[in-house]
C-alpha cells in the first residue's frame, strides 16, 4: 500500500487526493527507475527538482486571477467543453473533463486528438469550448494541428 498522506478530502472533485496520487505514483516511478538502473543520480535529481517546483507554479496560476476571470467570463455561456490531447495528455483530458462536470455542471467530454476526424469533430459547434492539453514536446505539432482543425 502506498500512502499519500493527503488528509481528508472535502471537495466533491477530489482534487487533493488526485494530485497526491499523481505525485506518489511519479515518486514511485522515479524510485523504480533508479532501482532498475534506468535513471541515474543526475536524472533523479532533475525529476525531483521538477516536483519541488510544482507549488510555486501552481501559486502563479492561482495568483493570475485577472486572466482566469477573463477566461471564465468569456466562456461562461459554453454549453459544451471538449478536452483534446494525445498520449498521456489524453488521461489529463479525461480528468479535466470530469472536474469540469463535477464543479461547473457543464457538459464535458475528453477526446484523443488523433480521433477527431472519426466523427467527433462534427460535435463541435459554435460556442463549444475546446481545451487542448499539450505537455509532450514530441506530440506538440500533431496536437496543435488537430486543434487548428476544430477552430
Map each language-model feature to its residues.
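A SIS-like phosphosugar-recognition module
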Residues: 1-151
Amino acid at each position: 500500500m502506498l500512502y499519500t498522506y493527503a488528509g481528508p478530502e472535502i471537495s466533491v472533485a477530489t482534487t487533493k487526493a488526485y494530485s497526491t496520487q499523481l505525485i506518489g505514483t511519479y515518486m514511485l516511478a522515479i524510485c523504480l527507475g533508479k532501482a532498475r538502473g534506468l535513471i541515474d543520480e543526475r536524472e533523479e535529481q532533475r525529476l525531483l527538482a521538477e516536483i519541488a517546483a510544482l507549488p510555486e507554479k501552481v501559486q502563479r496560476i492561482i495568483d493570475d486571477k485577472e486572466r482566469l476571470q477573463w477566461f471564465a467570463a468569456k466562456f461562461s455561456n459554453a454549453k459544451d467543453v471538449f478536452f483534446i490531447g494525445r498520449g498521456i495528455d489524453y488521461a489529463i483530458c479525461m480528468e479535466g473533463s470530469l472536474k469540469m462536470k463535477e464543479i461547473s455542471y457543464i457538459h464535458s467530454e475528453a477526446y484523443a486528438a488523433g480521433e477527431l476526424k472519426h466523427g467527433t469533430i462534427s460535435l463541435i459547434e459554435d460556442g463549444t469550448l475546446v481545451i487542448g492539453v499539450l505537455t509532450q514536446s514530441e506530440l506538440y505539432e500533431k496536437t496543435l494541428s488537430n486543434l487548428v482543425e476544430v477552430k
